[in-house]
Amino acid sequence: MASTTVAQLAAELSRSAAALLEQLQAAGLGKATPEDIVTESDKTRLLDYLKRSHGQADDSARKKITLTKRETSEIRQADSTGKTRTVQVEVRKKRVLIKRDEAGADQHNEAADQHALAAEAAEQARREEEERQQAAELARQEAEAKARREAAEREEAERRAKQEALEAEQRRQAELLARKAEEEAAAARAVGEAAEDASRKKAEDEQARVAVERAAAQKAADDAKAAADKARAEQDAARKRREAAEAEARAIQQMLNAPARVLKAPSERKAEEKKAEQTGTLHKPVKPASATATEAKAGDKKPAATTTTTTATTTADKKGKTGKPGSWQDDSSRKKGSGLKTRGDSSGGVGGWRGGPRGRGGRQQHADDGRSNFQAPTEPVVREVHVPETISVADLAHKMAVKASEVIKQMMKLGQMVTINQVLDQETAMIVVEEMGHKAFAAKLDDPEALLVVDGEEHTDAEQLPRPPVVTVMGHVDHGKTSLLDYIRRAKVAAGEAGGITQHIGAYHVETERGVITFLDTPGHEAFTAMRARGAKATDIVILVVAADDGVMPQTKEAIAHAKAAGVPIVVAINKIDKPDANPDRVKQELVAEQVLPEEYGGDSPFVPVSAKTGAGIEDLLEQVLLQAEVLELKAPVDAPAKGLVVEAQLDKGKGPIATILVSSGTLKRGDVVLAGSAYGRVRAMLDENGKPTKEAGPSIPVEIQGLSEVPAAGEEVLVLPDERKAREIALFRQGKFRDVKLAKQQAAKLETMLEQMTEGDVQTLPLIVKADVQGSQEALVQSLQKLSTAEVRVQIVHAGVGAISESDVNLATASKAVIIGFNVRADAGARKLAENHGIDIRYYNIIYDAVDEIKAAMSGMLAPEKRETTIGQVEVRQVFRVPKIGAVAGCMVTDGLVKRNSLVRVLRNNVVVHTGELDSLKRFKDDVKEVKQGFECGLSIKNFNDVQEGDQLEVYEITEVARTL
């Protein structure tokens, strides 16, 4: 292309060169002289500048081109008259072409360039970050290597220091021995010189002795030196062994860290093998060319079978380059069936050969030459086994990495027959683990109850506010506990109780002028031990009620023990002081004997004489209780989820499970989700002790709640949880855990139970089904009935529950032939009718000791009667007659008592019993008689005994059965 100068362009445009130069410079083109070259791009830029300077925009017509196309056609169409007409049809098509904006394209390209630059910058930053991380990793590895080197150097320095100290000690011992020998030699020389004038012979003897001692000293020094050399040699040997072990460990680590071998092409493999043959190794040195040629010739032939491992390995090496797996030559050699044809490799695979099935050589494979011959030590692996509360035999074997049959064998050795799916309890499983050489730990895994601890810790920082004291009234039966509470509460509970005794634990709160007090009334009967223990567990202060006319009784002592075990203070209320025979001083002395000291004797228990009948001393008693509470400084969080204790629980036919809750901390509200043992639910209704609805209950306030899934066990802890799903999960977990633990313990005790039944023999059992109104009464009644069991008659509680007697209870009694006991409950109409049809005995009681007495009487009737022997007469044989077909007939005289027909007799000869049997016949003269009295003669014969002699004495007796009692 010909170049154009400024002057030529000015001539073409009919302008002066100076004016064109001014315009070029204004357009940003550095043209100074008319001889400067003007390119096409310069012309374009100049044209754009001139357009902008004159205000001319780009012509839109040049960017937008419209193409119009017309097509004309004819259509023949008939009209209504039948004539054909020709219609001209014109079709117009319009197409618009828009030129793309170059500026927009440039902007797009610029954006793309910016994006590419940003991506490149990000990639560069990532690379720099990776380099920094690699540098940090290298620095960390170098620091670790340096630390290891420094530790090794410190260890080596310590070892050298110890060795030098040992050598110094040995040198010092040798010097001491040598110095001692020299001193002894000097002393000997002095003695020899002194004695030389006296006797030369004596001097010679002395010199000989000194020589012997010197030899002994020299020998001792030599022995010490030899011992030092031996110790040094042992240290060197130990150091060498340690270094060898470390080197071997490093080699093993390098082998484990080495990259995996990959299959290579045959040419690469041959080159490597050729190089290896030229270099050689420690175990396979370089062979001369003649030996290599000999081996190559020998490799063309089939190798002979041999029985030694070395020959087999050498032959495998001579086979050429087809020994490695993964090569094509190896596949062809396998197809041809070439290879060693032996009956088996006695080396156990050390030579690298594995025989095929049935000894065929075609399936043999040569092992990889790079495989190490190192074998790990076969020491037994001791595992740490975490054993849950219940575990099956299969799961236990899996945890120990052994087969289940090994665990079953071990259990058989321990004397227990198990199956692979049998569930073991934690104690048995831990014994098996220890017996098999592993370490057993009690596991607490996957326990949803761990969530309760976390939830409880979240509310520990709540504000602690004072709370009312919880006071438990305890004492012996009929000492006036409930009457005392009735006077305080201005109520009459005792009058409505069956038999005048308390059989339920009651919770009340009383508002006094000095504050609120919560009372727990416990039964005093001996059967309610667990109920009293629960009362002591939930209490802050114990009021011990002792009757002034009765003194300390067994349940009084038990209440003292419960209070001391719970660590709560005791306030003694000496009741019934209004009686004429009241003796408070005697009560004090008896309580002092039980380690309950009054304050006037220097103790810490206030004694208050009261009368529940007249109300004397009640105010003083409440004042002492509040004083004790003030000393204890009882506080509890109020604005927190509630916690409490199940005081009592029962099953109502219309309301369902009902639980009496004593709130210990927090506030229980209606609608809260509660968890009590294995029972859970949402609080649907909440009543106070008077049966009035309430919306919330604070600390130390007793309430009755409804809405639980089942009747909770009395004494269970009550918690409020945030959602019902978590409560249901924990409740189901507790139910399953209780069921699994119970089942596992039953299985573990099967063998023991079997042995007990074998030793017991035939034992009478009295099956019972117990239904009570509340949980505490049912628990107390069951415990009292089970205590009645003896070695001959055993009480079997088939089922115990809370609520009315239902048809399912009657069906269970029919199947188990049991007697149903209802304590403060009745059977519904359907259950009564079903019991009459099946003849099931249902007994109703409302006083616990009435039930215990009747069951005791029934058990007495089941006892086998006692047989007692009573002597009724003595007979003397005077003469013996031998009667054919009858045998011996004794003529006798009744000397004492009387003789009855068919009586039992004992034949005594010289006061020795020779026969015990029964009379066959009894006659007086020729007549059969029923009995013969003292002083009369009679004739008699004994069944199956004819050796009656004159002078024998017959002792006549009878056995009577006497009914026994428990």
UniProtKB/Swiss-Prot annotation:
Residues 500-504 are annotated as: G2. PROSITE patterns: G_TR_2 (PS51722), IF2 (PS01176). SUPFAM superfamilies: Initiation factor IF2/eIF5b, domain 3, P-loop containing nucleoside triphosphate hydrolases, Putative DNA-binding domain, Translation proteins. Residues 611-613 are annotated as: G5. Residues 99-382 are annotated as: Disordered. Residues 475-482 are annotated as: G1. Residues 521-524 are annotated as: G3. One of its GO terms (cellular component) is cytosol. PANTHER family: TR-TYPE G DOMAIN-CONTAINING PROTEIN (PTHR43381:SF5), TRANSLATION INITIATION FACTOR IF-2-RELATED (PTHR43381). Belongs to the TRAFAC class translation factor GTPase superfamily. Classic translation factor GTPase family. IF-2 subfamily. HAMAP family: IF_2_B. This is Translation initiation factor IF-2. It comes from Cupriavidus pinatubonensis (strain JMP 134 / LMG 1197) (Cupriavidus necator (strain JMP 134)). The lineage of its organism: Bacteria, Pseudomonadati, Pseudomonadota, Betaproteobacteria, Burkholderiales.
